[in-house]
Amino acid sequence: MSTFPAPVLGTPLSPTATRVMLLGAGELGKEVVIALQRLGVEVIAVDRYADAPGHQVAHRAHVVSMTDPQALRQVIEQERPHVVVPEIEAIATDLLVALEDEGAVRVTPTARAAHLTMNREGIRRLAAETLGLPTSPYRFVDTEQALREAIDGGIGYPCVIKPVMSSSGKGQSIIRSADDIAAAWRYAQEGGRVGAGRVIVEGFIEFDYEITLLTVRARGADGQIVTQFCEPIGHRQVDGDYVESWQPHPMSPAALQRSREIALAVTGDLGGLGIFGVELFVAGDQVWFSEVSPRPHDTGMVTLISQVQNEFELHARALLGLPVDTRLRQPGASSVIYGGVEARGVAFEGVAQALAEPGTDIRLFGKPESFAKRRMGVGLAVADDVDQARAKAARVSQAVRVRAGA
């Protein structure tokens, strides 16, 4: 029998409090805050701008440049959390590694996982070169000329270019001929999270579909770490940004088994406790590793309505050492609600109409500022099958209209 001690949770805002700090307080972080608070955890939310969604529900909020190691160390030392939970990539992960090595704080799932996944180079080299997992052919380059040479030297056309540090499809494009290279290079330089720099160029895989396999490392009843899988999530992207997702996505038994093997290999190497969003390309029974996020995934917002425990509850339970339940409740779908306007303090119309249909729900993220293509909310739906759920979720998101405030 394991000697792992049973978790003991304290009372928020008291000397017994269990304190968790989230680095990143967007819409995903907000749901993690809520899940942790339901378990009696005292939560501190940190983001680079004021009034972020997670700030609005946390016990305390800080505005900090999380890529500044000195500023990040200061807020961690001030709050003295028991656990630090990175919710975005753009963080001074070298500092997290140092703090974890010092025994000053525990990082979920691990500081190494946060460090390796903060850019595409670390995780791709781990997956392809260390673990030997199947991936698209790739090269990392630093100049437009090197990009041309990589394509001519074997990557070929079409190919995909992405900044090594970006999210939500920013800076990502498809290069179909030599005429596209200059524009694609400029777009990648503009889309990187920390400015211009290194990119990955990948050979194009003719896949049938892509999935997110939410993979959870959590303590079992005996205290041992057990890996569990949610049902596969299908999703559709436009310009590299998720616009809808659904669960479960139909797969052959062989493809599902191979997907789980790949997810088990990469998450097992990254280690720790928590949820991982493993992105995979699938063609028939063949599966290729694409990316992994050591945190809840945007396509996983469908689990807010489709699962017994959603991805945020799974992450919260796992990082606290509690058992999890990854079962699907009912086929479901999510559909993004975009801002559509450039304004602060927007208002949402059509919400009653959106929720009039049975088996629907909605999340409005509470972002203080709207942009044309900024995610401001998500429509959710369940139905007897995925196709019905997708159509219903689309009706929910389309019914909501965003307008500038008075």
UniProtKB/Swiss-Prot annotation:
It is an enzyme of class 6 (ligase). SUPFAM superfamilies: Glutathione synthetase ATP-binding domain-like (SSF56059), PreATP-grasp domain (SSF52440), Rudiment single hybrid motif (SSF51246). This is Formate-dependent phosphoribosylglycinamide formyltransferase. PROSITE patterns: ATP_GRASP. Belongs to the PurK/PurT family. InterPro entries: ATP-grasp, ATP-grasp_carboxylate-amine, ATP_grasp_subdomain_1, PreATP-grasp_dom_sf, PurT, PurT/PurK_preATP-grasp, PurT_C, Rudment_hybrid_motif. The keyword ATP-binding applies. It catalyses: N(1)-(5-phospho-beta-D-ribosyl)glycinamide + formate + ATP = N(2)-formyl-N(1)-(5-phospho-beta-D-ribosyl)glycinamide + ADP + phosphate + H(+). Pathway: Purine metabolism; IMP biosynthesis via de novo pathway; N(2)-formyl-N(1)-(5-phospho-D-ribosyl)glycinamide from N(1)-(5-phospho-D-ribosyl)glycinamide (formate route): step 1/1. ATP binds at R120, K162, S167, S168, G169, K170, G171, Q172, E202, G203, F204, I205, E210. Its EC number is 6.3.1.21. The gene is purT. One of its GO terms (biological process) is 'de novo' IMP biosynthetic process. N(1)-(5-phospho-beta-D-ribosyl)glycinamide binds at E27, L28, E87, D298, K367, R374, R375. Mg(2+) binds at E279, E291. Residues 125-320 form the ATP-grasp domain. GO terms for molecular function: ATP binding; magnesium ion binding; phosphoribosylglycinamide formyltransferase 2 activity; phosphoribosylglycinamide formyltransferase activity. It comes from Bordetella bronchiseptica (strain ATCC BAA-588 / NCTC 13252 / RB50) (Alcaligenes bronchisepticus). It comes from the Bacteria. NCBIfam families: PRK09288.1 (NF006766), purT (TIGR01142). Keywords: ATP-binding, Ligase, Magnesium, Metal-binding, Nucleotide-binding, Purine biosynthesis. Involved in the de novo purine biosynthesis. Catalyzes the transfer of formate to 5-phospho-ribosyl-glycinamide (GAR), producing 5-phospho-ribosyl-N-formylglycinamide (FGAR). Formate is provided by PurU via hydrolysis of 10-formyl-tetrahydrofolate.
